[in-house]
C-alpha cells in the first residue's frame, strides 16, 4: 500500500543557554510552526501537500567531559485506531557551544496528496544516552481534506530557500517565503489562482497602497488534472523598525473564493 505519509528529520539545532546544574530530562515549549524558525502555527492540522513542523526544547541533558550531548529522538504518528502511519528514529549528537544542558529540536511531517483524515496522535520520545533518561509527549493532529487552503508556508533568508528564517528579522534584511495552495477548482479544465501580499502596521493599517499580486494560470486540460498544488514564492523587505503583520491572501479566480493567513513580523535594529 502506498504510504500517504513521509516522515523526515529536517534538523536538530543546538541553541543552548546556561543552567546551574543538570536537572531531570524534560521537553518544553512544544509548538507547531511555519518552518523550523517561523512563527507559531496555532492548529496541529495536516492537509494534502502540507508540511507541518513541530519544534520543542529539550532540557536537563547530561554532557560528557567535552560538553557534548548524545541523544536519540523517536517520532511516531498513529491514527485513531492506533495504526502506525509513520515512524522514524534519529540520533542527535552535538557540542553545546553556549554551555548549559538544553537545545532545540524540530521535526517535520511532509504530506503527499492524501492525508489520514480525522484524529491522529503524534508521539515523540527523546532519550539521553549519557544519563539513560527519557522524556516524551503526545499531541493530537487532525487530518483534513483539501479545501482552498494555504499550506506548507516557510520562511527563508535567501531566495533559493536554503536558509530557514524567523519572521523576527533585522532592519534591512529581506524576508523570503514560499507556500503551496490546494483545493482550487478544476471543473472548467483550467486553473487561475491569485496570491496577494500585504503588510499591516501595529494598528492594523495597510502599509502598501496596493498589495503585491502574483498569478498562476494553467489552461492545458491534462496539466490541470495532474496539478495537485500551486507553488508560490515571494518576499518583503524589512525597511523599518517595529511590529507588523504579513497578510497572505489566495483567491481562486475560477470561483472567486478566497482564504487568507496572517503571521507576525518583528523588525529590530542590527
Label each residue range with its predicted role.
Residues 1-4:
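Positively charged n-region of N-terminal signal peptides that target proteins for export
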Residues 7-16:
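Bacterial N-terminal signal peptides
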Residues 17-21:
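Sec/Tat signal peptide C-region and signal peptidase I cleavage site
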Residues 22-270:
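Intrinsically disordered, low-complexity terminal regions enriched in Ser/Thr/Pro/Gly
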